[in-house]
Amino acid sequence: MKIAILYREEKEKEGVLLKEKLSREHEVVSFHEASASNVVDADLIVVVGGDGTMLRAARKAADGTPLVGFKAGRLGFLTSYTLEEVDQFLEDLRKGNFREELRWFIRVESDIGSHLALNDATLERDLSGKMVEIEVNVEHHSSMWFFADGVVVASPTGSTAYSLSIGGPIIFPECEVLEISPIAPQFFLTRSVVIPSSFKVTVECQREINLLIDGTMVGKTRRVIVQKAEKYVKILRPIKYDYVAVIREKLGYGRRIE
């Protein structure tokens, strides 16, 4: 098996350690993420970092190439192992003891280009700007209007990212839905809505505001169209991986108070 190890530049030590252990049984190439080509040619991509590194690695992976993440960041929702679990990973790799989890991208079209996001597309005002009137149209339905600082359109993967911090729900990754969440709306009863992923979402603002793709600023625009993309990433999980346990541990959600 050909394995590529992708790591943040400041995590080179951890990347080298993984390479040494994996090289005993597999062909291994390794590089820090900034030096990686657009598409990584390998049977498996091992990522050392946090969710940001996993997001960037997902874009570099060819369709169908699985990723497995080792947590070397803060939360690590997308990672599957800690750096102390390398031996367990090697054992799982030998026996094929993994579950496959498919995470799909959203496509964001605007006058400044076409982008893929695994988490979310965000339209938001400058810090010094005024609130914005925003029209959101869900395909086959009439429009909704918000007077707010912006709006987030998120995939299930993105439901535990920015969207969660502005009051959006946690969505299980297997769900085929999109989530629309206004940012700091004027009316406190305005809440997130969840729609089928088969519908396109058109967002139009009264003026140009910032467009962010997975938290990265790509420019200013007034109008975007968001829909589920055909591209997906395959993440390998240990057989005993438990999503509820992850959100309980990392977010404190549903934790029993003794």
Curated annotation (Swiss-Prot):
Q: Which residues bind NAD(+)?
A: D51, G52, R56, N119, D120, K130, D149, T160, A161, Y162, S163, L164, S165, A184
Q: Which InterPro entries match?
A: ATP-NAD_kinase_N (IPR017438), ATP-NAD_kinase_PpnK-typ_C (IPR017437), NAD/diacylglycerol_kinase_sf (IPR016064), NADK (IPR002504)
| Gene Ontology terms: cellular component | cytoplasm
In the UniProt record, does the keyword Nucleotide-binding occur? yes
Q: Kindly identify the residues recorded as the active site.
A: D51 (proton acceptor)
- Which family, according to UniProt? Belongs to the NAD kinase family.
Query: What Gene Ontology molecular function terms does this protein carry?
Result: ATP binding; metal ion binding; NAD binding; NAD+ kinase activity
EC code(s) of this entry: 2.7.1.23
Q: Which reaction does this enzyme catalyse, per its entry?
A: NAD(+) + ATP = ADP + NADP(+) + H(+)
Ordered alphabetically, the record's keywords are: ATP-binding, Cytoplasm, Kinase, NAD, NADP, Nucleotide-binding, Transferase
Stated role: Involved in the regulation of the intracellular balance of NAD and NADP, and is a key enzyme in the biosynthesis of NADP. Catalyzes specifically the phosphorylation on 2'-hydroxyl of the adenosine moiety of NAD to yield NADP.
Q: Which organism is it from?
A: Thermotoga neapolitana (strain ATCC 49049 / DSM 4359 / NBRC 107923 / NS-E)
Swiss-Prot/TrEMBL cofactor(s) = a divalent metal cation
Q: Which cysteines are joined by disulfide bonds?
A: none
User: Which terms does the UniProt entry file under GO BP?
Assistant: NAD metabolic process; NADP biosynthetic process
Protein name stated in the entry:
NAD kinase
Q: Which Pfam families does the UniProt record give? A: NAD_kinase (PF01513), NAD_kinase_C (PF20143)
